[in-house]
Amino acid sequence: MVATLLRDDPAADVLIVERGDDVGGTWRSNTYPGAACDVPSALYSFSFAPESGWKRAHGTQAEIYAYLRRVAREQGITQRTMFGCALRDAQWDGDRARWVVSTSRGDLTADVLIAATGALSTPTLPKVPGLEMFRGTMFHSAEWNHDHDLTGKRVAVIGTGASAIQFVPSIVDKVEHLTLFQRTASWVMPKRDHGIASSVRSLYRRFPLIQKVVRGAVYSQKEMYVVGMTKPFARKYALPLFEKRARSVLRKQVPDPELRDRLTPDFAITCKRILLSNDWFPAITRRNVDVVSSALTSATENGVVDAAGNEYPVDTIIFGTGFTPSEPPVAQHVRGEHGRSLAEVWNGSPSAHLGISVNGFPNLFLMYGPNTNLGHSSIVYMLESQAAYIADA
């Protein structure tokens, strides 16, 4: 967003308020083992800052974080950022036609307020009775405790979403036993990941147009999925093929029919985001893994309890319970013309014009706003489109 504004007006008076100590957002914070992107590297980069050095078809957390830091530095973003500064409140002042912004480091005023807090900024922890009594170690995957050695530990993992599908295969060989709590099974497809040869990276550096063509080809391929997912004439043929492929993977990688049945979703494929992994099923079929088809209902001093009342002794609880993309915490702190917060106006059902602007909140723009996420391609494309719209407004 800021890079777009500065390209249009290099002298623009722009200040970024960032509660973290560095740029990078989710790729700065999520450092769990195996953290990587499920979108091809060819698309997971800005069009104005192509990266020829990706070492894998799907970038790792370390690669993406380094890329974002470099882009921020080169685009003049870092020097316009106030780090370690958390938003407390933002109120529209109609008399002055300005936003009055209160932060942990003082008050600011602005003609325009852009909420670019993202959808994956605040981890969600389930409200489970007894957690306060648990004597072991517990943490959310987005706040991974690297000081806690999992070697020989009995671990409970809560959740089987996009984070767990990456970190569980990375820790399963280290732990003594892993108990996986799965509330809802997900459709899983192979991840077309592979190394990118140094000769290819060199080719991209020497001939950027080739990389641009590859990017366009990958984008077009991803867009074809939309046709198969949304157009009635295509859904009739495409969705059964998608599901057949997913069931084939499940059948080959999970030999136990009872476990395979529990890992088979009870909803049509594409109703939720499809997870991509080559090592998820092999990991959770290990002898030291138990899959519990239940939510975590309570905790004790030495373990966790499922819905049937069964207790599992564990030393460590890892929450892979995701975030609250439909209820961004920033919505509680931004107040419009009538003094009501975004959260109050939305009342549990977020909506915005083009996912960007909300009636009653003048000169407020949302990045990654309601209903702008994707289930098939790169959010980077959406963010650039939103940034261009806001810059023209």
Feature-to-residue mapping (PLM):
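Rossmann-like dinucleotide-binding core of oxidoreductases
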Residues: 1-22, 108, 115-255, 289-290, ...
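Beta1-alpha1 glycine-rich phosphate/pyrophosphate-binding loop at the start
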Residues: 1-81, 182-183, 252-258
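Short hydrophobic core segments
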Residues: 17, 87, 107-120, 155-158, ...
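Short beta-strand to alpha-helix junction loop
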Residues: 51-70, 82, 233-242, 267-279
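Feature captures the FAD/FMN-dependent oxidoreductase FAD-binding
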Residues: 55-121, 246, 253
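A conserved short coil-to-beta-strand element within the FAD-binding core of flavoproteins
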Residues: 82-98, 147, 287-307
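Alpha/beta-hydrolase fold catalytic core
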Residues: 240-313
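Glycine/threonine-rich phosphate-binding loop and adjacent beta-strand/alpha-helix elements that clamp
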Residues: 320-391
